[in-house]
Amino acid sequence: MKTLLCSESVEVLEALLRLIQVGVGGFGRSWTDIVDSSELWDAVAYVDINEEALKEAAAAHEMPKDRCFKDLESALASVEADAALIVVPPKVHMEIALQSLKAGLHVLIEKPLADTMENAKRIVSEADKRSLKLMVSQNYRFRRGARTVRRLIETGKVGNPSYAVVNFHKAPRFRGFRLRMDHPLLIDMAIHHFDTMRYIFNSDPSSIYCETWRPKWSWFKGDPCATVMIKMENGVRLTYVGSWVSLGWETTWDGDWRIECSEGGIHWNEKVKSKLRDSANEVTERFVPMPLEDRAYSLYEFAEAIRKDREPETSGQDNLKSLAMVFASLESAESGKSVSVNKYL
């Protein structure tokens, strides 16, 4: 019996949508749990080049051996599906996404959409050509905190936002490809915060200036730290400071947000608090209710987009703007100059 991940119910549809999950080891393993808990999706096949990861995921969720495959081509030839969930390293995103789309499957893909803007645009173009849904799982904006901050700004309670400072400090001990990246924080993590910025301020970026570095104690090959200054099209400015080798105090994965507005301010760090000008009192805001949250909401939004034949909130086309922020940051870090984000779109 599949159970919901949140106290509020969602509309349960009679027929589950069928999903092939490509990549079930590492982070993909946690996705198998979320898919298995969904009342909207049914995993009909697992695909992974790592035989041990495949066996472990199959054993955990009673996936029959004849529905476990080492390549997507074999899975497509053996099972019928509505969509593919892609949880593999970014360098093979385009290959797997194009293969899925050409087979007529809708695609939900982990961020980043692709390893280059050119490859990301190819995936978006293929989905558009075939009238299939392409969604990037930017799950950080699907959390109650982010939803609550945006609602608070939209109410006008604290006035118009002017600038924000976002701090992110973690020390994850990853294995695999992230350790070998030149810019692991920017490529694999900051896109979550960049996308959340676009969502919260309901605006797109215009220019970016970035510096990155590698502390002596870092266990990453590349630069795991960055400072990014962002100007949005609506005039809001942001300063983002991030680290994946923080040995002192850590933030949540969402980060610590301080937003200065014309009538007060907002502080989001687990809880969302507001404070009006000339007031000694701060108010803890009530979270926006959501039927599901995080990656469970990604699956819900993806299913809704397919069922209702509409674009998902974090469609591939929309996500190009978040991905462009990453590549503009990378260019700025290399050149030492401010970079226009639109040049990547």
Describe the function of each predicted region.
Residues 65-72:
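Conserved SAM-binding strand-loop segment of SAM-dependent methyltransferases
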Residues 21, 109, 115, 134-136, ...:
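Hydrophobic residues in well-ordered beta-strands that form the structural core
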Residues 1, 5-16, 83-85, 121, ...:
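C-terminal helix-rich "cap/oligomerization" subdomain common to oxidoreductases
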Residues 30, 49, 53, 288-299:
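Active-site loop of classical SDR/Rossmann-like NAD(P)-dependent oxidoreductases
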Residues 78, 83, 89-141:
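Beta-strand-loop-alpha-helix segment that lines the small-molecule cofactor/substrate pocket
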